[in-house]
């Protein structure tokens, strides 16, 4: 089937009480493997390119490869930019055919984060892309994540003034492997969800690697509909390579390298399968996709200074021949 709108995927997650996995890639051979495993599981999936990966994986090439693989599948597939480095990169992802983009202004001052995220939202919506913002920085240890958790009232102000469709929250989650068991602040997550309910903004959890299953399920109950995974996938992929090299320490012929890479991909796909089961997204095919009822509250355009307008684009335009099904 054609690529699906990210917001349609998230809407179904919210209605049916599960989360979609957002799986980072670092090569053009990975989307097909991941989508095949998602197809086997009957699970929707978001295939994600992080902003830092653009020099290695061209956005347009990535979008075309992923869209081609999605057409062969019967499960909903979206393409997402994670942690977009700046507005220019975010625009390139929109033009390439991503169905959603994340502009990460979390390291900026609050007002500058609001200002630039609002520009990203205006730009993304003119391309038909959903836009994710981040409030509260994701650290790499307990020491720094406790200092920068998302404030519920600030989250309300941020969403109201920017109009973001998806908000990445910091509630004790972190990138990379956790040193010990992560302690998610569920009370804070519940407060954030209640604060944002009038605005139709979806919540996403980054740093999903290593979070226990009961914490994942509780997070979903409290409104998380998208969970990002990368570290675990890389770890399992590397284990696949190591296992292959242990069995075949010397060059074995023309298929040696392809077989080694296939072992790595199998590790990636196994990680996706484990996560999809934990996120309760298996067996969720196309039925019921569609936008949520109720209209999203528009951003408060009087809440800040004027921002530059961007050139208008046709709604739903997708560069490079990539498109998604706008009738789902």
Spans of model-derived segments:
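Alpha/beta enzyme core
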Residues: 6-16, 26-52, 60-76, 84-199, ...
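A short N-terminal beta->alpha junction/helix N-cap motif
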Residues: 18-26, 50-54, 259, 263
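Short catalytic-loop micro-motif centered on adjacent basic/acidic residues
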Residues: 20-24, 79-80, 102, 203-206, ...
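Short gly/pro/ser/thr-enriched loop/turn and capping motifs at secondary-structure boundaries
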Residues: 53-55, 108-110, 233-238
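Ligand-binding grooves and catalytic loops that recognize ribose/phosphate and carbohydrate rings
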Residues: 55-71, 262-274
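Generic enzyme active-site microenvironment
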Residues: 80, 132-134, 204, 275
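C-terminal alpha-helical cap/extension of soluble enzyme domains
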Residues: 212-328
């Amino acid at each position: 089937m054609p690529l699906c709108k990210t917001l349609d995927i998230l809407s179904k997650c919210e209605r049916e009480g599960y989360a979609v996995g957002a799986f980072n890639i670092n090569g053009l051979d990975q989307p097909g493997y991941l989508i095949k495993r998602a197809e086997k599981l009957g699970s929707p999936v978001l295939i994600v390119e992080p902003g830092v990966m653009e020099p290695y994986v061209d956005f347009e090439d990535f979008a075309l490869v992923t869209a081609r693989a999605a057409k062969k599948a019967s499960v909903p597939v979206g393409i997402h930019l994670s942690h977009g480095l700046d507005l220019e990169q975010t625009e390139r992802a929109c033009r390439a055919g991503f169905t959603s983009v994340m502009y990460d202004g979390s390291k900026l001052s609050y007002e500058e984060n609001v200002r630039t995220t609002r520009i990203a939202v205006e730009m993304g919506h003119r391309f038909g892309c959903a836009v994710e913002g981040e409030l509260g920085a994701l650290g790499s240890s307990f020491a720094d994540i406790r200092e920068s958790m998302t404030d519920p009232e600030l989250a309300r102000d941020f969403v109201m003034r920017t109009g973001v469709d998806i908000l990445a929250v910091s509630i004790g989650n972190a990138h990379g492997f956790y040193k010990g068991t992560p302690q998610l602040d569920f009370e804070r997550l519940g407060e954030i969800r209640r604060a944002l309910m009038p605005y139709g903004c979806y919540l996403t959890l980054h740093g999903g690697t290593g979070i226990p299953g009961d914490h994942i399920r509780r997070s979903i109950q409290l409104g998380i509909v998208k969970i990002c995974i990368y570290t675990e996938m890389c770890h399992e992929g590397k284990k696949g390579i190591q296992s292959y090299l242990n069995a075949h320490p010397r060059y074995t012929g023309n298929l040696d390298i392809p077989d080694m890479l296939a072992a790595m991909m199998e590790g990636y796909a196994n990680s996706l399968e484990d996560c999809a089961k934990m996120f309760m997204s298996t067996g969720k095919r196309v039925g019921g996709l569609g936008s949520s009822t109720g209209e999203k509250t528009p951003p408060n355009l009087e809440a800040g200074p004027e921002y530059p307008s961007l050139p208008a684009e046709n709604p739903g335009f997708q560069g490079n021949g990539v498109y998604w099904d706008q009738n789902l």
